[in-house]
Amino acid sequence: MAPTTLLGQKTSTCPYGRQPDLHGYPLNITELAAHLDGTCYVTRQSVESVAAIRKAKAAIRKAFQASIDGCGASLVEILSTCNSGWKLTPAQANKWMQQNMFAKYPKGDIKDTTCLAENARHNNPTL
């Protein structure tokens, strides 16, 4: 079971569904990381469509660039399916993810201070 497995969701290691008293609650990892000092870019993306894959790739590139530029730490969380574990076709799994996971784990940038870091470097070239 992943940290993001939803309550009641069945997995191969949790065949009766995630129960909070037994397995704990799902973790909003990106929201937690966004509050940490030193993070500059925290985002949640998905891979359910070509457009979503392109956004995820751009987010990964941006995270690497932020690291190269010395802006701080980045975290890119990728929501994806587990077709075989969910016993669904890929299309069914994508639909299930859109209908169930996106409500709990909304996609998009949660923290982005990379532009601020870039502006600071331009104002003080020694950074």
Model-derived segments and spans:
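Glycine-rich ThDP/TPP pyrophosphate-binding loop and its adjacent helix/strand module
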Residues: M1-T126
